[in-house]
């Protein structure tokens, strides 16, 4: 759950470091404020200064929409060239609800579980890979998006459509998670094929 303030952020950073020492990959939802988290701190995060990661085991996820066009990033998704690692489906995701029900939800908290699922798939087939390796496989094997998109949260009265930016400016990787490509890259790393 993304917040603007953390009374015990040092505890969270220690927990991240502990998870790293146990080779655990943490998949973190970037948040749903349509803002650049490179300039506006949100918690939890894996950086004390918005520049340097405290550990290489946290994968922060932005949400993509159902559209493969300028509306690809979800209009609510947080983004950041330094602090969001990759995007994943996060709009109208069919999920469970209490009392054995189902409903469609949107948010980076829907994008993070699909990414965690891909990470689990990679690690189940290739258990010798470290958390850090899996993180970088997901970031580097995703579908590269090479077109302009509407920057999330940029629509205004003066500019109802919003500001156009290259998708690659919204995350470290400029990519969308892709399970097949992740498995192929993992296989190449492990088996050298």
Residue ranges of model-derived segments:
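Glycine-rich, charge-decorated loop segments at or immediately adjacent to ligand/cofactor-binding or catalytic sites
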Residues: 28, 32-53
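Extracellular S/T/G-rich loop segment that most often corresponds to the catalytic His/Ser-adjacent loop
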Residues: 22-24, 46-124, 128, 132, ...
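Short alpha-beta junction capping motif
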Residues: 19, 23, 27-29
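Short acidic, glycine-rich surface-loop motifs adjacent to enzyme active sites
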Residues: 1-8, 29
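Short aromatic-enriched loop/helix-cap "lid" or pocket-rim segments at secondary-structure transitions
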Residues: 40-41, 72-75, 148-152
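Solvent-exposed, polar/charged alpha-helical surfaces in well-ordered, non-transmembrane soluble domains
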Residues: 10-21, 116, 120, 132, ...
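Residue-level marker of structural boundaries
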Residues: 35, 102, 143-144
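C-terminal subdomain of the subtilisin-like protease fold in secreted/lumenal serine endopeptidases
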Residues: 57-60, 126-193
């Amino acid at each position: 759950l993304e917040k603007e303030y953390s009374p015990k952020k040092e505890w969270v950073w220690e927990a991240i470091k502990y998870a790293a020492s146990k080779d655990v990959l943490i998949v973190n939802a970037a948040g749903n404020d349509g803002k650049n988290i490179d300039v506006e701190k949100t918690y939890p995060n894996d950086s004390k200064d918005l520049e340097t990661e405290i550990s290489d085991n946290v994968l922060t996820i932005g949400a993509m929409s159902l559209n493969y066009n300028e509306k690809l990033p979800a209009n609510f998704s947080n983004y950041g060239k330094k602090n969001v690692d990759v995007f994943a489906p996060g709009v109208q995701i069919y999920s469970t609800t209490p009392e054995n029900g189902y409903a469609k939800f949107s948010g980076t908290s829907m994008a993070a579980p699909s990414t965690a699922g891909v990470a689990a798939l990679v690690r189940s087939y290739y258990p010798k890979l470290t958390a850090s390796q899996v993180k970088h496989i997901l970031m580097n094997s995703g579908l590269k998006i090479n077109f302009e998109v509407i920057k999330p949260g940029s629509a205004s009265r003066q500019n109802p459509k919003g500001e156009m930016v290259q998708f690659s400016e919204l995350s470290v990787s400029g990519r969308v998670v892709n399970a097949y490509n992740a498995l192929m890259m993992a296989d190449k790393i492990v088996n050298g094929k």
